[in-house]
């Protein structure tokens, strides 16, 4: 009988999607041992099977979620399923755009794939972790793999510098999280998020506020929110571009999932305090991220500051704390996956053909490569929030949710900074399209001839076409996508409790 009860409480089926990722890690490491030629052939196939199986198992869990597993340390509720699916998809696209880049850099493919899958495993586990210990293990799994990926180009001093900076700042963030967790454990005597939330309701104190600040600092680091963003531009510029693409979506999505769960569960009695702090972070991120992006000359640094601003937009939905706001958050992160990775696909293709990352070198690109120009233009317009792109509808849902919840200042600043972002996105597009042939950059003048045939497309081109198509046409499906996001929120018990409490208070 005790063994049966233990098995029921374990609910190991909750982590079947992560188990497939783990099998993929083992498989890629084994083929890597067989030699680079074998790894180049089989590592991509193993990754596709691993991620595809994980996504399929997540789809099966959608109608039968597990709301408590591993003695309450992990939840595979609908919200966790949605975030884990976004992360798995971002990994799939990131790997598609990385194979050619990794081969050209002379790096081992099997080893690279294993580290990317390890980061994915940590990110997916973080989305459903409901215990301070499981959160820390997931955070560190994601973080250590991210450090390795940032410094993967061992012969490139910029990559090594990026990895060292990321390691130092990330280690400090982990230490801050542990310090805050020790306060929470000392106040409650438990490591379970829900139990801690119940225990500290009647214990408002300086220590509790300090724990909130420490935990929020860790969240801000993971989502690259101002003023915890300093690592982002340098790491993005120095790291391999496919790694930057993954970190900008997969790692950030895991950070937002972590934020929603711990703030809504553990600090539900400090609702006003953490929402005020989150509002400040959102305003600073939207303002600084988009304003500083105006002055960038590197495409990767511009996208780095753009991602900081995008984090500020997503925070509007979390601060609103309503059904529509949280649903808009899920929808926008799904949209961000395609429009951001689509932009990075174009940047990688351009850098592989030219070796350049400078924005000025894109001058006149339309004359030599109209398809990259079109793809990058559509993705940048979507990031700026122009209709009828998918990003426009994502932002509209966020702004409507914020306005309905009386977050007027946040929405107004969001609208103003969106206009600023449109300016620097359109500046890049104008440079690619408007320049006359004689005004094209020297890089573009010597641009190689391109065959854009459909037959035998390499993975990078498949990823580019898919992301651009979803970005451009996804606006048509924005309503069904929002309904899916709404289901993820409405079918998640802990969120419904929080939303009901907020409605009663209002």
UniProtKB/Swiss-Prot annotation:
Protein name (Swiss-Prot/TrEMBL): NAD(P)H-quinone oxidoreductase subunit 2
Gene Ontology process terms (BP): ATP synthesis coupled electron transport; photosynthesis, light reaction
Subcellular localization(s) per the UniProt record: Cellular thylakoid membrane
Catalysed reaction equations from the record: a plastoquinone + NADH + (n+1) H(+)(in) = a plastoquinol + NAD(+) + n H(+)(out); a plastoquinone + NADPH + (n+1) H(+)(in) = a plastoquinol + NADP(+) + n H(+)(out)
EC number(s) recorded for this UniProt protein: 7.1.1.-
Disulfide bonds: none
Protein function: NDH-1 shuttles electrons from an unknown electron donor, via FMN and iron-sulfur (Fe-S) centers, to quinones in the respiratory and/or the photosynthetic chain. The immediate electron acceptor for the enzyme in this species is believed to be plastoquinone. Couples the redox reaction to proton translocation, and thus conserves the redox energy in a proton gradient. Cyanobacterial NDH-1 also plays a role in inorganic carbon-concentration.
Pfam families: Proton_antipo_M
GO annotations of cellular component type: plasma membrane-derived thylakoid membrane
Topology relative to the membrane: Multi-pass membrane protein
Highest taxon in the source lineage: Bacteria
Molecular-function GO term, any one: quinone binding
Keywords: Membrane, NAD, NADP, Plastoquinone, Quinone, Thylakoid, Translocase, Transmembrane, Transmembrane helix, Transport
Gene transcribed to yield this protein: ndhB
Sequence similarity: Belongs to the complex I subunit 2 family.
Name of the top EC class for this enzyme: translocase
Transmembrane segments: 14-34, 42-62, 79-99, 108-128, 132-152, 167-187, 206-226, 240-260, 276-296, 302-322, 330-350, 374-394, 409-429
Main localization of the protein described in the UniProt heading: membrane
Summary of subunit composition and partner proteins: NDH-1 can be composed of about 15 different subunits; different subcomplexes with different compositions have been identified which probably have different functions.
Stored InterPro entries: NADH-Q_OxRdtase_suN/2 (IPR010096), ND/Mrp_TM (IPR001750)
